């Protein structure tokens, strides 16, 4: 990488984990962030009776949906904190989470939305292949 090149990073993500690949001067740093998405589902007994809150009875679907939304937002905040200082961001992944992450950045961090250079579909890959794909995108050998 030349000295005048920008700091680039790629994010491979799905609903369970994100792999962040930061490309700096002559170095590649890889980090993993796990989501807590599995915790978003039913607690014991909740699928039968729902949750009670004072005089209200909330359906378990509403409670689970809110819990899932909050966990997803926390997950996206963690990822963004790791990549916010990069000049260019490349997002890849197999499902809809990558689109929701891009929308999260556009809504919550408008000043940084221009850093997203691409958002591409990508199957589940081994770590080495994810790194290779991100390097290839940024034309780094």
Task: Please report, for each region that a protein language model flagged, where it lies by residue.
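Terminal alpha-helical anchor/extension segments at protein ends
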Residues: 1-141
């Amino acid at each position: 990488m030349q000295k005048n090149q920008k700091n680039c990073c790629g994010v491979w993500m799905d609903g369970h984990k994100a792999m962040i690949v930061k490309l700096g001067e002559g170095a590649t740093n890889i980090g993993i962030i796990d989501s807590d998405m599995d915790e978003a589902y039913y607690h014991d007994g909740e699928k039968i009776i729902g949750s009670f809150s004072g005089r209200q009875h909330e359906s378990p679907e509403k409670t689970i949906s809110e819990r899932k939304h909050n966990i997803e937002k926390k997950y996206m905040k963690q990822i963004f904190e790791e990549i916010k200082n990069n000049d260019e961001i490349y997002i890849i992944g197999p499902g809809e989470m990558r689109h929701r992450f891009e929308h999260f950045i556009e809504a919550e961090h408008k000043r940084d939305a221009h850093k997203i250079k691409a958002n591409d579909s990508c199957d589940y890959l081994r770590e080495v292949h994810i790194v290779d794909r991100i390097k290839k995108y940024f034309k780094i050998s």
